[in-house]
Amino acid sequence: DEKYRWSSWAAPKTVDGEFDHDNALTGSDLMEFVDGELFPYLKGFKLRAKSPDTIEYKIGEIFSEIKNKIQSGYSLRDALEKVDELRFRSQEEKHELSHLYEVKIKNMGNAGRNGGEYYTPRPLIRAMIDVLQPQIGETIYDGAAGSAGFLCEAYDYLRQGGASNKQLSTSDLKTLQEHTFYAKEKKSLAYVIAIMNMILHGIEAPNVIHTNTLGENLQDITPSNQHDIVLANPPFGGKERKEVQQNFPIKTGETAFLFLQHFIKMLKPGGRAAIVIKNTFLSNTDNAAIALRKELLENCNLHTVLDCPAKTFLGAGVKTVVLFFTKGEPTQKTWFYQLDPGRSLGKTNPLNDKDLKEFIELQKGFEESAKSWSLAITDLDTDSKGNGTWDLSVKNPNQAEEAPLREPQAIIEEIIALDKESEAILGKIQELL
């Protein structure tokens, strides 16, 4: 529709190709057009699209969720002219734009605004993908999509040929675009960010559904809903209502524990997962945590646990681990790696790919080192009937024991003795004077 084309309303040009200031809408005229005509028109794409898996439908969804936040038509006019100067038709230009978008998402996380929801450090995501090694033809799912960082990084990994550097055929590219990536997101802003992020990375019609993932009863998930790979970082510390908990066999208000049950169910038999979760999952003694650890270890092979350092997630303020598991076979042994970059992480010193290089290399053969060790499931706190805590919070046996903390009384006595010694020395100095 010509009226709504960028070249008609946002950046009209003269016959010489110069910006046409005489015909460009501005001020109240521009605001009336954008709010009263343009947004409703774009919102209508959802109704006019042939199917939900088209980019037209996704555009309609985006404009159903957002509102124009710019209140001045003159400020909007200035912004439009700046945008018109941008060029993003080539792949290189699109890549630059997607990188800029990622930086903005990262800044949201670093500022502590929705950091746990929107931004998982990309080096950590890439390491998780390197361990799982997805292949063309497999489906990849994230039921807590946030900004869709996992799916965008997985797309880049596969687009570049994956672990085997495969040259992709036309059929492979079609599969990658249409039948590989699936996601769900509850929050409106995160949902819009996810769709835009995927489009900018090159996934033209993202399979992202705007829904509360935990509102789905686990019993309703059929084999046709399941996926080969799950990559996710569910929200930290959320609480769910009683009616939502009824959808799960292990009932708990802890959102991350409900998500973990969902992810296990969403995996095909033999499917692989890498899930970020709070490190307290390994040791919590409440009934739900114990039951969930038992469920995971008895029905999945939890082959790897990556222990992340403090401030890996800059906006979240919690310590995390990454659980790597395969569905359908019980755990016999779990390999742990204690990630220690040798420095304190922070905004100016974030996690990088080099920090995770050793983990990726050692994980291939589950090798022991100063930072890695293995734990046999038979060594866990359980009996022959499966009763016990199933506590996985083992300490690194390859590190020297820290000196035990002294008793407060002993410290006080030493301070008193040192004070007396200092007093005696000062007395001798005074005598000399």
Language model segments and positions:
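Homeobox/homeodomain signature
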Residues: 20-23, 53, 66, 108-109, ...
